[in-house]
Curated annotation (Swiss-Prot):
NCBIfam families, sorted: PRK03606.2-4, PRK13395.1
PANTHER family documented for this protein: UREIDOGLYCOLATE HYDROLASE, UREIDOGLYCOLATE LYASE
Protein species of origin: Brucella canis (strain ATCC 23365 / NCTC 10854 / RM-666)
Gene3D superfamilies xrefs: Ureidoglycolate hydrolase
Keyword Lyase belongs to the record: yes
Annotated keywords: Lyase, Purine metabolism
Name of the coding gene: allA
Name of the protein this chain belongs to: Ureidoglycolate lyase
Length: 169
């Protein structure tokens, strides 16, 4: 099996734009609400929920922690809805995404999300399942429910991608 190394990039809105949204207050539109006692950071992600008998779900995922090296052997995508991950414990996590190459994902990219950043994967974006770092971590997950199967998985057969370090280049 051939193994290619992925370099971890810092998570920025610009770099992540082809895959979805970075959820953070930095640069967000601020509105004061509740008689000025609450700051609302408005419209941070594009939530998508298509299909039949569709609704938006709010879940908590508890992710086991990973340490480098991490081998990326598979990816998944959701054809009918976006999926957002917002860390609840303030810990960093890895985000691995790829554009579609027709018969599966293209070469993945890896991003390091800070503990105050979340991500929203748009519909049909290939991504690796949750990669919490440091210790077991909880994430608020905004997801889609509906009649259609909203999960496609792809397993790399002849190669894998390896993250040698969780630090950014």
């Amino acid at each position: 099996m051939q193994i290619e190394t992925l370099t971890v990039e810092p998570l920025t809105k610009e770099a992540f734009a082809p895959f979805g949204d970075v959820i953070e207050v930095e640069g967000a539109q601020l509105r004061l609400i509740n008689n000025g006692t609450t700051e609302r950071y408005h419209d941070l992600a594009r939530v998508e929920a298509a299909g039949t008998q569709t609704r938006v779900l709010i879940n908590i995922f508890r992710g086991q922690s990973f340490a480098a090296p991490i081998d990326i052997m598979m990816m998944e995508r959701h054809p009918f809805g976006s999926q957002a991950f917002i860390p609840l414990n303030g810990r960093p996590f890895l985000v691995v995404v790829a554009e579609d190459a027709g018969a599966g994902p293209a070469r993945p990219r890896a991003f390091l999300a800070r503990g105050d950043q979340g991500v929203n994967y748009l519909r049909n974006i290939w991504h690796h399942p949750l990669l919490a770092l440091e210790q077991k971590s909880d994430f608020l997950v905004v997801d889609r429910a509906g009649r259609e199967d909203n999960l496609e998985e792809y397993f790399f057969s002849d190669y894998a991608y390896r993250i040698e370090t969780t630090q950014t280049a």
